[in-house]
Amino acid sequence: SGVPYSLGEPFFDSAESVIAHMLFSVPGVKGVEFGDGFEGAKRRGSERNDMIINAEGATLTNNEGGVNGGITNGNDIVVRVAVKPTPSISLEQRTYDFERGEVAPLVVGGRHDACIARRAQVVVEAMVALSLAELRLREG
């Protein structure tokens, strides 16, 4: 919250593009959506348009997730990411062994996070903050 309106550009350096670029740089991130995202894509425009309710530009809803046409609109930035499960698990798996030239059992040793999603939340929030700072600096 507290993001000013007018950060971003309509093309290439849109607020969504800059944020998504940073988020997809986080290992394990496989998807990014803004506002009502993929669910909103199933609805009609008349059902999900964010109605402006006053001269300051406040909206009744925030289906766009704080960004319209690539530019922040003053609403809260709402972004969600999908993080893949960690592949380094303690269960035996089967995979190709290049030394032996065949599919063989693999057991990953050492200490690994069973779930990276909890740690990813802090990193995702930081990346969004850095993205917004970058957009603010581009304003001049």
Where on the chain are the PLM-derived regions?
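Internal helix-turn-beta structural module
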Residues: V78, T86-G140
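Glycine-rich anion/phosphate-binding loop at the beta-strand->alpha-helix junction
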Residues: S1-V103
